[in-house]
Swiss-Prot record:
Its EC number is 2.2.1.7. Thiamine diphosphate binds at H78, A119, H120, S121, G151, A152, N179, Y286, E368. One of its GO terms (molecular function) is magnesium ion binding. Mg(2+) binds at D150, N179. It catalyses: D-glyceraldehyde 3-phosphate + pyruvate + H(+) = 1-deoxy-D-xylulose 5-phosphate + CO2. Gene3D superfamilies: 3.40.50.920, 3.40.50.970. This is 1-deoxy-D-xylulose-5-phosphate synthase.
Length: 632
């Protein structure tokens, strides 16, 4: 982008440069930053609405605080593009979320200004508290700041941290970025004046001295306390956060630098835990995003002058769409079905379900632990809960999955979206670990559909069971298999031989069946669609093992403890010795990039699978040699 389009912004290579900008020019700088951000994301795709809403707050934080000496932890982290632009990564924004490029989230290894890696929500206060107390222990004068959205504040972990932080006696600032106006709007000039007053040292000192004096006269102290709360209640929310031990300031307009900067400058000189409530608007400064922040939450490439266009109709359904349609169809015939999502209504494909069955739809917010136990309670009373959740987010409810669902053997269906590689969101969102962490839990079954139609059928199979079942499926579309309209279920715990071939057999778990079939055409090997990791189809496995000289397992999940490990365990238990090649996601965190490229780098595309089999079992791949029993 030409420098003359952003004359101020192009002088900023780090926050030290930002602090040299006259305050009167910061508004113009924020305008340039917002325009640069909009046009940059329009070329790469990425999170937009949330970033447009944090421009002024980001400018103010880096202007007032001495970053990176002072620490800033951004909750969730998808709102950090302005932060990246101001901290030396402006020219790399063209590589955003691409293989080898900038992450869409903060990463400690990417910049010294990324103090803590985030992507899952509600972790910022805990991390910032740790940093603040570390500074206190080491005798270092610095502030630790957590920036958290009102949505992330619905998670229990955030309140656990607030409860701990309020009595920690350290320099911690929690900034509530209220971008849904779900708590309270700002109330004009009076509120701005009050925020400045409440963040001042005189107010803080007077309040503390007054409380100390009045504690000698309890009735007077309680009266003064109630009067203070009542006075604040006229212009600010109830003093919930002061109950945690914080000095509450706000709410103030998060797009008003003349309010933000003086307030932050006052806070910088205060001791102890501070809580600043700022109100921002998602999509701020771009009318189309302001009007529809959900649509512009994470758009692909688009023309800012035109806006998002209606996507071309794809001949392929996504797995998410298949799930959403199945959910509605099953709910129409079974009144026991209830749907639960932890703040992922759109992403999990539940919009139509909410519209058609509003009394049976529950969005519990960013509260995965609660979602799982809530489902358990519903199941106890004879309902059939379906929890639609991304694979990576089920990790956050693992204890509840074991303690509240599995031990009681309750019939909860977990529809695990985004299983396997997720592409641009990177390691934090990869659904790599669900097979290992689910298959080790007694009573829990795990299904891996190979295509869209099988996904629908296995969801029906899962729903028919009287115990917990997880059905894992990837992001995006599959092979383009036509999805049947019925609700027929596949046999529980049974796989199938899809192709008979030579003395090597590929055992495919999930959508990697399709590259396995491509390999089979070239190497003339057998391909088995296993469908279930647990219960494993041991009878089929032992039959295939008896008919072949070697086995290959393929899965889009962590290889350690995964489906391949289940095969090895079953063979060992049966006393069968057979060479087994395990192919899956390696023991490493896989960063962001194009999913197809990432799969190839893991050796899990057709070419990679073929190369691995050829290298390991070349002597067995004799043309024309057949496993006769498999053919029969």
């Amino acid at each position: 982008m030409p420098h003359n389009s952003y004359p101020l912004l192009h002088t900023i290579n780090d926050p030290a440069d930002l602090r040299l900008v006259p305050r009167a020019q910061l508004g113009a700088l924020a305008d340039e930053l917002r325009a640069y951000l909009l046009h940059s994301v329009a070329k790469t795709g990425g999170h937009l609405s949330s970033n447009l809403g944090t421009v002024e707050l980001t400018v103010a934080l880096h202007y007032v605080f001495n970053t990176p000496h002072d620490r800033v932890v951004w909750d969730v982290g998808h709102q950090t593009y302005p932060h990246k632009i101001l901290t030396g990564r402006r020219e790399r924004m063209a590589t955003l979320r691409q293989l080898g490029g900038l992450s869409g989230f903060p990463q400690r290894g990417e910049s010294e200004y990324d103090d803590f890696g985030t992507a899952h929500s509600s972790t910022s206060i805990s991390a910032a508290l740790g940093m603040a107390l570390a500074a206190k222990i080491r005798g270092e004068e610095r502030y630790a700041i957590a920036v958290i959205g009102d949505g992330a504040l619905t998670a229990g972990m955030a309140f656990e941290a607030l409860n701990n932080a309020g009595v920690a006696d350290c320099n911690l600032l929690v900034i509530l970025n209220d971008n849904d106006m779900s708590i309270s709007p700002p109330v004009g000039a009076l509120n701005r004046h009050l925020a400045k007053l409440m963040s001042g040292q005189f107010y803080a000192a007077a309040k503390n001295v007054g409380k100390t004096v009045l504690k000698g006269a309890p009735p007077l102290f309680e009266l003064a306390k109630r009067l203070e709360e009542s006075a604040k209640g006229m212009v600010v929310p109830a003093t919930l956060f002061e109950k945690f031990g914080f000095n509450y300031i706000g709410p103030i307009d998060g797009h008003d630098l003349d309010a933000l900067i003086p307030t932050l400058e006052n806070i910088k000189h205060l001791k102890g835990p501070q809580f600043l409530h700022v109100v921002t608007k998602k999509g701020q400064g771009y009318k189309l995003a302001e009007a529809d922040p959900v649509a512009y939450h994470g758009p692909g490439k688009f023309d800012p002058a035109v806006g998002l266009q209606a996507p071309a109709t794809s001949p392929k359904q996504t797995f998410t769409q298949v799930f959403g349609q199945w959910l509605c169809d099953m709910a129409a015939v079974d009144p026991r079905l209830v749907g639960i999502t932890p703040a992922m209504r759109e992403g999990s494909g539940m919009v139509e379900f909410e519209q058609r069955f509003p009394q049976r739809f529950f969005d519990v917010g960013i509260a995965e632990q609660h979602a799982v136990t809530f489902a358990a309670g519903l199941a106890c009373e004879g309902l059939k809960p379906v929890v639609a959740i991304y694979s990576t987010f089920l990790q956050r409810g693992y204890d509840q999955l074991i303690h509240d669902v599995a031990i009681q053997n309750l019939p909860v269906v977990f529809a695990l979206d985004r299983a396997g590689l997720v592409g641009a969101d990177g390691a934090t969102h990869a659904g790599a670990y669900d097979i290992p962490f689910l298959r080790c839990i007694p009573n829990v079954s795990v299904a891996c559909p190979a295509d869209e139609n099988e996904c629908r059928q296995l969801l029906s199979t899962a729903f028919a069971q009287n115990h917990p079942v997880a059905v894992r499926y990837p992001r995006g579309a599959g092979a383009g298999t036509v999805v049947q309209a019925g609700l027929e279920a596949l046999p529980f715990g049974q796989g199938e031989i899809r192709r008979a071939g030579s003395s090597v057999a590929i055992l495919a778990f999930g959508t990697l069946l399709h590259p396995a079939l491509q390999v089979a055409e070239k190497l003339n090997v057998t391909v088995v669609n296993m469908r279930w990791v647990k219960p494993l189809d041991v009878a089929l496995l032992l039959q295939v093992a008896a008919d072949h000289d070697a086995l290959v397992t393929v899965e889009e999940g962590a290889i350690m403890g995964g489906a391949g490990s289940a095969v090895l365990e079953a063979l060992q238990a049966a006393g069968v010795l057979k060479p087994v090649l395990q192919l899956g996601l390696r023991d490493e965190f896989i960063e962001h990039g194009d999913p197809a490229k990432l799969l190839a780098l893991q050796g899990l595309d057709a070419a990679g699978i073929q190369a691995s089999i050829t290298k390991r079992f070349a002597a067995l791949l004799v043309p024309g040699r057949l496993a006769l029993k498999a053919v029969a």
